[in-house]
Amino acid sequence: MASLRGVESVFGAGFRLWPGGQTPGELYSVPSSGLGPTRHTLNPMVTGTSVLGVKFDGGVILAADMLGSYGNMARFRSISRLMKVNECTVLGASGDYADYQYLKQVIEQMIINEELVGDGHSYSPKALHSWMTRVMYNRRSKMNPLWNTVIIGGVNNGESFLGYVDKLGVAYEAPTLATGFGAYLAQPLLREATEANPNLTKDMARNLIERCLKVLYYRDARSYNRYEIATVTEAGVEIEGLLSTETNWDIAHMVSGFE
């Protein structure tokens, strides 16, 4: 204490050796904020709901609505969640929109790097699907996942491809796929149609997708009646945007039991 008084006599009574810290005789509690893992990605801000995909004879169709939900609020109503990767591959993503934008930037740079080589090679749907499984599993293993579920569709060497990857890196291929709430509402309708007719035509597949989008708009609070449809055939990729489905709410007063 004598040495402390000597310091105070030189620097003044208000001088502290450790500003903001403990004083002699006091207990000091180490602040805990900032010492835990980063958790930004565990709280997605703007999210998109279902993405649907179905194979048809000669190609693949993917569809997604254009709503970005900020929590429970329908905040952004014209955002795209379908991406043309190249002339044979298209990607659709549900989940956190910021993570999707990051993925999109990475993939676009990969495509540019591949084109600079100039060897005529391009990423096939199956190659992109395999790469996505590694990316998602790697981020999940770092406890910092990309909060997305992705559907990749395309045509390569005359063969249609439709693959699924979630934020844990779980991946599989199927003739019909749906993410988000669509996995519960749209997938049964898609499977029923494809099991009854495995060789759907392009028009039949499109009508089926539009029917499922309408069901989702009626039943999914995070869905919207504006949507995009991507069609992939040997001729290339075509994305039609800002389409709108016609709805009829005349029977809404008859719906009960959900109050």
Regions found by a protein language model. Give the residues of each.
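Long, low-complexity N-terminal extensions
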Residues: 1-259
